[in-house]
Curated annotation (Swiss-Prot):
It is an enzyme of class 4 (lyase). The gene is moaC. The lineage of its organism: Bacteria, Pseudomonadati, Pseudomonadota, Gammaproteobacteria, Lysobacterales. The active site is at 135. Pathway: Cofactor biosynthesis; molybdopterin biosynthesis. One of its GO terms (molecular function) is cyclic pyranopterin monophosphate synthase activity. It comes from Xanthomonas euvesicatoria pv. vesicatoria (strain 85-10). This is Cyclic pyranopterin monophosphate synthase. It catalyses: (8S)-3',8-cyclo-7,8-dihydroguanosine 5'-triphosphate = cyclic pyranopterin phosphate + diphosphate. NCBIfam families: moaC (TIGR00581), PRK09364.1 (NF006870). Signal peptide: none annotated.
């Protein structure tokens, strides 16, 4: 078992091995935050064209559309991931910028005050924003790639992960 594991048991399986939603009713209500990021890699010619056009495509503003789609996804994560709790999202922020010549970095930070964390919401927001960038640019090339998508940090639960955002 890895050193950072709390137990070998998966929390979304009950004692009989059946899928279940975690009961968070006994957890303390605390401020929760999480940041996730995803990346979109473009072919060199496509990246150059996007830079020249100010990250606009024939479909419109790429960053603006990705932020809207990512925010919508954050708010609907519980409808996409079966055992996620519906959460009252207090804040959702995106940072989208170039990380090198061909790599667009998408960072999503989510905050709420609740009994459970917002990691899945941040991961979903970053993922859907990246998928939206792909959709907005696919007329230029299908040779783009997405990833890695990862949790960068989380705060407010039993343990904190990563640097504070």
């Amino acid at each position: 078992m890895p050193a950072n594991s709390r137990s070998a048991r998966l929390t979304h399986l009950d004692d009989a091995g059946l899928p279940t939603m975690v009961d968070v009713s006994d957890k303390a209500v605390t401020a929760r935050s999480a940041t996730a990021e995803s990346r979109v890699r473009f072919p060199a010619a496509v990246a150059a064209q996007l830079r020249a056009n100010g990250l606009r495509s024939a479909k419109g503003g790429i960053v603006e559309t990705a932020v809207i789609a990512g925010t919508m996804a954050v708010k609907r994560t519980h409808e996409l991931i079966p055992f996620c709790h519906p959460l009252p999202i207090d804040a959702c922020r995106f940072e989208i910028d170039w990380a090198g010549e061909q790599l667009l970095n998408i960072r999503c930070t989510v905050r709420c005050v609740h009994r459970t964390g917002v990691e899945m919401e941040a991961l979903t927001g970053a993922s859907v924003a990246a998928l939206t960038v792909y959709d907005m640019c696919k007329a230029l090339s299908h040779s783009m790639s997405i990833g890695p998508t990862k949790l960068v940090s989380k705060r407010g639960g039993k343990r904190d992960i990563g640097a504070a955002q």
